[in-house]
């Protein structure tokens, strides 16, 4: 039977995403849901900027399987709702963004901030508290530089917090740089990767393929036992 513990590592442009990781400052080990490249077509060439890995708590499988078991990878990758369920699900997500090309913290944080604020204002949900959180987000990245191989690490928790860490040596640090208590930002960071307009279709494809296999081989009884949690959380 396929289980999260049977998840394999992935190599994306010589960036190795291990099969499981323990996020900074956390006691839980998360499994690799999927990984892929982020790039952009520039003057006829596909330029690769980063490799992105998305890790999930083990309980994500029974929680998602209650609704998505039996779906093919193709059905999942084309479902906005499936990825929304990952973003909002009551389980931890860990996103590792590793540089292929160099990037400054200022460039990265300003782009993410502009995207978040734009969406929130369009939806009429932007608040002064959000503005204060964005200021903290920009501050933590301000003096950072990320050469090839360096990583930005995000842990999205069900309690609505976003933990941010940096790695320059390919290792996962034990301690986090900062924890921001803002559920909208926590969800927006991972949604920017795998949401409807996510920046990495390759990561979405990888997630859909691997999670489809894990869910379709998941034990029915465990799935049934987890279903009340899904409905309770409105998924």
Curated annotation (Swiss-Prot):
Pathway: Secondary metabolite biosynthesis; flavonoid biosynthesis. It catalyses: a chalcone = a flavanone. Its EC number is 5.5.1.6. GO terms for biological process: flavonoid biosynthetic process. InterPro entries: CFI, Chalcone_isomerase, Chalcone_isomerase_3-sand, Chalcone_isomerase_bundle_sf, Chalcone_isomerase_sf. GO terms for molecular function: chalcone isomerase activity. It comes from the Eukaryota. Substrate binds at residues 50, 192. SUPFAM superfamilies: Chalcone isomerase. Keywords: Flavonoid biosynthesis, Isomerase. Belongs to the chalcone isomerase family. Part of the biosynthetic pathway for all classes of flavonoids, a large class of secondary plant metabolites, many of which are brightly colored. Catalyzes the intramolecular cyclization of bicyclic chalcones into tricyclic (S)-flavanones. Responsible for the isomerization of 4,2',4',6'-tetrahydroxychalcone (also termed chalcone) into naringenin. This is Chalcone--flavanone isomerase 2. It comes from Chrysanthemum morifolium. The gene is CHI2.
């Amino acid at each position: 039977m396929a289980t999260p513990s049977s998840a394999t590592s992935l190599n994306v442009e010589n960036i190795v995403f291990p099969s499981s990781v323990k996020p900074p400052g956390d006691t839980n080990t998360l499994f690799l849901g999927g990984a892929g490249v982020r790039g952009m077509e520039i003057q006829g060439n596909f330029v690769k900027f980063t490799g992105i890995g998305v890790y999930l708590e083990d309980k994500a499988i029974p929680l998602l399987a209650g609704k998505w078991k039996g779906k093919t990878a193709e059905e999942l990758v084309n479902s906005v709702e499936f990825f929304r369920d990952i973003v909002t699900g009551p389980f931890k997500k860990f996103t590792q963004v590793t540089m292929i090309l160099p990037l400054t913290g200022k460039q990265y944080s300003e782009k993410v901030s502009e995207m978040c604020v734009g969406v929130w204002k369009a939806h009429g949900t932007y608040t002064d508290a959000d503005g204060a959180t964005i200021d903290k987000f920009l501050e933590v990245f301000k003096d950072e530089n990320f050469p090839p191989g360096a990583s930005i690490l995000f842990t999205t928790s069900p309690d609505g917090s976003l933990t941010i860490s940096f790695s320059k040596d390919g290792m996962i640090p034990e301690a986090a740089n900062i924890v921001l208590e803002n559920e909208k930002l926590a969800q927006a960071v991972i949604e920017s990767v795998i949401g409807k307009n996510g920046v990495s279709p390759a990561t979405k494809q990888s997630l859909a393929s691997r999670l489809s296999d894990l869910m379709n081989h998941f034990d029915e009884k465990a799935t049934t036992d987890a279903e009340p949690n899904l409905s309770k959380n409105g998924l």
